Amino acid sequence: MFNRRVLFLSVFSCAVFMLSGCSSNRFASRDANATYVNTQLKIIPRSQEKIQAQSQCSRSFSLLQKLNTDKFSMYRNQFDEINDAYFFYKRNVDLMNKDSKELMASVLDSKLDMVCVRVDNASFVGIYGKMKKVMDL
């Protein structure tokens, strides 16, 4: 089942990349908003509790695209780096010993959580900045 999930996500990612080439949005090639983040978050196997938290991360990431494109791009790149590291892990997992597997899986999971916290915070700061203008009236 896990291999089917990885295969589906790989095919889905390729389809998104190919279809987004026709878009004029400069972020469209890798940033299908919530779809992009959901794809990134689902790549690493996660507990049910973390799966629920990823929906908030996804919404915050979509909001951040509208609030601050520079931060959005920065966090998109961080998601990409985590994704690349995970695919390295998957390609080489048979060569790793038990401790290496556990360490790499743990670091990837922690980094993914950290990027989600950063995205949530940046979205909050962006909303606060917009509301501060209104509050200062």
UniProtKB/Swiss-Prot annotation:
The keyword GTP-binding does not apply. A lipid is attached at residue 22 (S-diacylglycerol cysteine). Keywords: Lipoprotein, Membrane, Palmitate, Plasmid, Signal. It comes from the Bacteria. A lipid is attached at residue 22 (N-palmitoyl cysteine). GO terms for cellular component: membrane. It is found in: Membrane. It is a lipid-anchor. This is Uncharacterized protein YuaE. The gene is yuaE.
